Amino acid sequence: MKVKAAVFRETHQALSIEDVELAEPGPEEVLVKTVACGVCHSDLHALHGGILAPRPTILGHEPAGIVLAVGGQVRNVGPGDHVIACTSLFCGACAQCVQGRPHLCADRGASRRGADDAPRISRAGETIHQFADLGAFAEAMLLHHRAVVKIDKDIPLDRAALVGCAVMTGVGAALNTAQVVPGSSVVVFGAGGVGISVIQGARIAGARQIIAVDLLDEKLASARKFGATDVINAAAGDTVKTIRKMTGGGADYAFEAVGVSKLLEQAFYCLAPRGTAVLVGAIPHGEVVTLNAAHFFLEKRVMGCMMGSNRFTIDAPRYLEFYRQGRLDLDAMVTRHQPLERIDEAFRAMTAGEVTRTVLTFD
């Protein structure tokens, strides 16, 4: 099957719109027509070399679509089903999977084709890789069946797509990773798509105070609409000092949702005793974070967060039910729609802070 895709060939260069060939689905694979795909900062990090990815590769990892065909061993979805996909592939058999932590699967390679198998995607004999095992900036995707979950057909696919990454990560960071408790105080550094999702997760969890921190007043105003009770423009002064004053001695939870090491340090220092800082953003590979060890005697802690500690097949329907109930606002998160050919404009708007989420749509 020949489809159009945005191919990443060189760092810091525009993606190349190319025709690529998708193989027939293998026994455990699913062919999905891409209807919508959110544009995430992780795609841009990969384009700039901050996340290591083989090349050439098709970026994009926040899609929703319609199943076109399935392999003979696939039972969870069938042709015509509406699905969302997530990068949290899992084998189902390793120690992490059987203990209920599929997002930390030790053998996600089991869901890929073998070295001796024909590639899923190619162009004139050249193997084209799939970023995050998805490669969703394309008119169709060939995926392992454990990468997709069936959703109800009445949910708009451009909204549902966000659940695959931004919402899964941000809401999950609050509900699953940190397990925010009712009545607590929360700080979120960064009011982009993931940060807004953390804010919504904290609101759903019943946080008493939710402070959004960003450099753009427009994004801070948006954060209030999604549940932030207070906002801080980080350019205005000493952010840590301001947070400690606003919270009466420090926050119970602080989330770094940008991917900047200095912000993780600020998240740690703004905590109250026994507070928890959570790294949600993708800090570039190799960067070092420096913390004053004396603060650990106050029983503060720092946690990593992998995709919101998700159990994708359970959490995706759960979060979409929050959407149905009006508790999770996906509609307002979709700021713009763009065709695949406008992917570079989507990256520009994201970098400029003009959007919460741009969603690519496919005819």
Task: Give the positions of each predicted feature.
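Mid-domain Rossmann-like dinucleotide-binding core that forms the NAD(H)/NADP(H) cofactor-binding site
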Residues: E139, R146-V148, D152-G237, K241-T242
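C-terminal hydrophobic helical "lid"/dimerization subdomain
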Residues: M1, G249, E265-Y269, P273, ...
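Glycine-rich cofactor phosphate-binding loops and adjacent beta1-alpha1 units
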Residues: A178-P182, V194, A205, L215-D217, ...
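Cysteine-cluster motifs in flexible loop/terminal segments that predominantly coordinate metals
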Residues: T87-R146
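Residues located in well-ordered beta-strands
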Residues: K4-A6, D19-E21, K33, A64-I66, ...
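Short Gly/Pro-enriched turn/cap motifs at secondary-structure boundaries
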Residues: E21-L22, P54-G60, G78, I128-D133, ...
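Glycine-rich beta-strand-centered segment in the early N-terminal region that forms part
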Residues: A23-C37, L47-V98, H103, D152-D154
